[in-house]
Amino acid sequence: MPQLKIARAVKPAELGYTMPAEWEKHEATWLGWPHNASDWPGKFETIPWVYGEMVRKISADENIFLIVRHKHDENFARRIFTHVGVDLRKIKFVTQPTNRGWTRDTGPIFVRKAESGKRKAETAIVHFHFNGWAKYDNWRKDTKVPEIAARLLRKKLFHAECNAKPFIIEGGGIELNGRGTLISTEECYLDPKIQVRNPGLGKKEIEATLKNYLGVKNIFWLAKGPNGDDTHGHIDDICRFVNAKTLVLVREKNPRDENYKPLAENWERIQDLRLEDGGKPEVVELPMPSPLYFDGVRLPASYANFYICNAAVIVPTFNDPNDRVALGILGELFKNRPVVGINAVDLVWGFGSLHCLTQQQPDLGRRQTPSTN
């Protein structure tokens, strides 16, 4: 493995790095091959086939880094991909033991410094540390993934810290427009008692650290996420930017549903959001599917958990009448990308979906403008 370049004394923002928006061009997508059957008890056998469909769609116009535990997993993945028609030349297998495959939260988070004069554009990796969503005990293998990625890609690695302690944030807990605004939830990162990621840190310190490591200037807090989310309020089930000035926000129309009040509160709060330039964003309503249960457990089924790749926008669907409605709304917002549904009924039994499994690696080129969505 190449020698690792670790930057500790300076923060990414000081060097001009910022986190690009998801719709900007990708060099690759990172995924972790599913192997922890306890994440999908009773349904694990179907999950590799969902991955096959995801990889087929994503790899149409970008490379895939797929984290596997060993050669057996790699060979199994190759068989699945061959069956569904994936071009294996687009897949780079990365052998690294992991606890789970939720790469949005455990994988490398990339920041980029733009080209300036004789200075070339470059990307680096921020290691926001991971503690199993402050809920599970088996996470120590997962926390090594960003370092492995930095070594493999020969990228500079920034270890996120606050008050000389590792700073914990998951990729699914932050949503950015690539121009300076970040949205998260109080439930996820400001709750002082439940699933506490950074004990002892208050809102001011958390915001300052996010600004230092992601290059954002403007942070806005929604309240809570939908019931069934075992991450305790990840934003990627609630609210997503589709371009620099437009976002979708989920809404529950049934007043008897347990999600009605918390999601309604988010709609009240979003009226106060101002972007980094002081402007007010356009907010588009995204419906919720009917409640989805398995073994009596409510699952965090949400159309907001879509992933924007170069070739398409892949959207979780749930055999629900609102599948078509959600796909239609997103199709109107992403004019220049096909919007494609992927059945996620079994996948969401793992308490996550398409966005939770993916992590984008931005291209070094110029950012795409919102009109190219």
What is the role of each PLM region?
Residues 2-368, 373:
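The feature marks the mature, well-folded catalytic cores of soluble enzymes
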